[in-house]
Amino acid sequence: MMHQIYSCSDENIEVFTTVIPSKVSSPARRRAKSSQHLLTKNVVIESDLYTHQPLELLPHRGDRRDPGDGRRFGRLQTARPPTAHPAKASARPVGISEPKTSNLCGNRAYGKSLIPPVPRISVKTSASASLEATAMGTEKGAVLMRGSRHLKKMTEEYPALPQGAEASLPLTGSASCGVPGILRKMWTRHKKKSEYVGATNSAFEAD
């Protein structure tokens, strides 16, 4: 027969086992006794492993956390130096995600990588004009036209502008995104330069 006595204190749980030998001892009973004895030893060893922490670090009764998690959390806190504040480790904001594609107009840094290259229709003008327009479209990745109204306005202001330079504009963009001031200056400078050089579109000239 085997009697187990449990004594619980503040620091750890101890299991005392008393084995009373019976008069008739068969080998099966001996095996059962030895296995039970080993079991109680394992219980004592495991309780010694987990009960060296102070009681303050264990979760309260009102907590819904798993007790295993509380033990791990307590061990992490004791291993940390006393100067480190536990709130500093969890200071990372949770609700912030990557910027979405709908917020492209206000964010120039992500405009380069998130706007896919769109095929453009370009008619040959002078070599410098077409190269400059293509470089502006690919490098900046920004919107250079607001729609048909913008095109009409440009043709009204600059009637000598060749049709090829208008056609080489990228076909991306929406009315909500405005043209940046630097790009607008570059574009007007390019138009004035093409007027002074006298670049003409040979594809639309009469033979």
UniProtKB/Swiss-Prot annotation:
Record GO biological process: neurogenesis; neuron differentiation
Keywords attached to this entry: Cell membrane, Membrane, Neurogenesis, Nucleus
Annotated region described as Disordered, given as residue ranges: 55-102
Residue ranges with Basic and acidic residues bias: 58-72
Endoplasmic reticulum as UniProt keyword: no
Localization annotation: Cell membrane; Nucleus
GO cellular-component term (any): plasma membrane
InterPro entries assigned: Vexin, Vexin_dom
Pfam families listed in its UniProt record: Vexin (PF15505)
Keyword Isomerase among record annotations: no
Reported function: Required for neurogenesis in the neural plate and retina. Strongly cooperates with neural bHLH factors to promote neurogenesis.
Family as reported in the entry's similarity comment: Belongs to the vexin family.
Protein name stated in the entry: Vexin
Source lineage: Eukaryota, Metazoa, Chordata, Craniata, Vertebrata
Recorded name of the encoding gene: VXN
